[in-house]
Amino acid sequence: LVGSEMCIRDSNSGKILESFRPEERFPMMSTFKVLLCGAVLSRVDAGQEQLGRRIHYSQNDLVEYSPVTEKHLTDGMTVRELCSAAITMSDNTAANLLLTTIGGPKELTAFLHNMGDHVTRLDRWEPELNEAIPNDERDTTMPAAMATTLRKLLTGELLTLASRQQLIDWMEADKVAGPLLRSALPAGWFIADKSGAGERGSRGIIAALGPDGKPSRIVVIYTTGSQATMDERNRQIAEIGASLIKHW
């Protein structure tokens, strides 16, 4: 199966502006890290967590692709630094450490359920959650559900204004999604995004973007089951982005 799915929502009204296969399940891959940091910020807002709390960890905690956490084995990292690493650099150990603070994958799923998302689910940790087995519902979402959830996190009342701004700031500082939507972005456009990559040709991105420096729409794109190389998958998403912008 080769599949791509997409959903675009107006970030103010929530109205679906364009969609393709919006209610099919695809693996979330690292795009879940935005939802995870949203859950962490929710705990901060409730007084159950502190962004400045330092978390110490060991070599045994490190998993594949941990470019930031591997440099801080001696001094540890704060919750704020871990969220930044998870979103801006897609650091997998940072994500696992943050998952531990909220109680694991099931608690992230429960958080999403409580905010009205009965579709998106996280079942495993990094890096196993990127396995992307066909017809496996573990660690998946649907683009319409993800678009709605992302909109609620970034513009709704679920998080405080400060936490909403913090989440979008981390996404705006994303350093690993350059070849995707960002490569098609005209000067002056705003983008805050998070990409994901997995096995079996899986690739994805969730983003808030728009002209005049303002995020006016939520864009969610996932693809899986492709034989394409990573460069080809990146180019495919960039081309979708260019088309979206052309017909904005």
Q: Would you name each region that the model predicts?
A:
Residues F26-I55, A86, V219:
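Active-site SXXK
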Residues L62-L97, P105:
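Conserved catalytic neighborhood of penicillin-recognizing serine enzymes
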Residues N12, L51-V68, I102-G103, W170:
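Acidic helix-start/capping segments at beta-turn-to-alpha-helix junctions
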Residues T78, N96-T155:
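Mid-domain, small-residue-enriched loop/turn segments at the edges of structured enzyme/sensor domains
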Residues S4, L17, T100-T101, P105-K106, ...:
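Structured C-terminal helix/loop/strand segments within mature extracytoplasmic catalytic/sensor domains
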Residues R9-N12, Q59-N60, I87-S90, T101-I102, ...:
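Active-site-proximal beta-strand/loop segments in catalytic clefts of secreted hydrolases
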Residues L1-C7:
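Short, small-residue-biased leader/transition segments that mark boundaries at the very start
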Residues S42-D61, T109, T160-S163:
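Short, well-structured active-site flanking segments
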